[in-house]
Amino acid sequence: IIGITGTGGACKSSLTDEIVRRFLLDFSNKSVAIISVDPSRRKTGGALLGDTIRMNSINNERVFMRSMATRQTNASISKDITDAVEILKAAEYDLIIVETSGIGQSGTEIIDIADVSMYIMTPEFGAATQLEKIDMLDYADIVAINKFDKRGAQDALRDVKKQYQRNHNFWDKNPDTMPVFGSIAAQFNDPGTNELYLHLIKIIADKCKLNWKSTLSLRIGNAEKIYIIPPNRTRYLSDITKTNRDYDIWVNEQANIANNLYAIDRLKRLVGENELPNIDNKKLMLHPECQQILE
């Protein structure tokens, strides 16, 4: 049983979908059951139950998904979740995923029913001291920093790895080896999500004593956003329009200088050259190409 929890808006459902998609490709003879919990509103008592909108990989005969409401406020899972999990166990699903609703800093209910727990967060958690308040960093087997394309994501990854090391007293290990991964669930074949999945399968195999081993050939590494227009060219069209505007301004300035020179030259013919001031300085203001055109 994998318990997936995290802050609201961290795209837990999207990341769950990416994990399910890879699992179905990796293990062609195994089945998956997903229970997705949505919060009930205190005012109306209703729940959206809209996590299936994010799931693109569940249209498969090996996948079962059910959305549930918490039926109570200030709770991340339903009181009936234990019975639901027992039913899925009886149905002999190979992998059961329980996704909670969004939690705060103190929500840890998922660890009571899950064999492996995953905490999903975003880089926008505030100051590094806020990490001290997140209970799930004490219990999570694996941590995903989703939306890794956000500004400051690399700093967030470093801070969370150090916090995980402190919380678990892994002082003899390098912080870079902590099970904390950056991911971009909205990006196809994201290398960070690939690495997260491979590590998750390894944790499941170790903790549950299963002979599961991934055979997928996946590109791994830090999550990197794939841009349609490279960041160093994002102002490319703007630069073109600015160049055109600057050229138009320059042309108008040169045209005014040429008009003035023409007027002075005509006046010189009428009243005589000795009656006019020296216009050589005025000619110097005209671009050589423009002088050549006039000549």
Regions picked out by a protein language model, each given a short descriptive name:
Residues K202, D206-E295:
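Extended helical scaffolds that flank P-loop GTPase cores
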Residues I134-S214:
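Canonical P-loop GTPase G-domain recognition
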Residues G3, D38, I81, E99, ...:
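Residue-level signature of catalytic and energy-coupling elements of molecular machines
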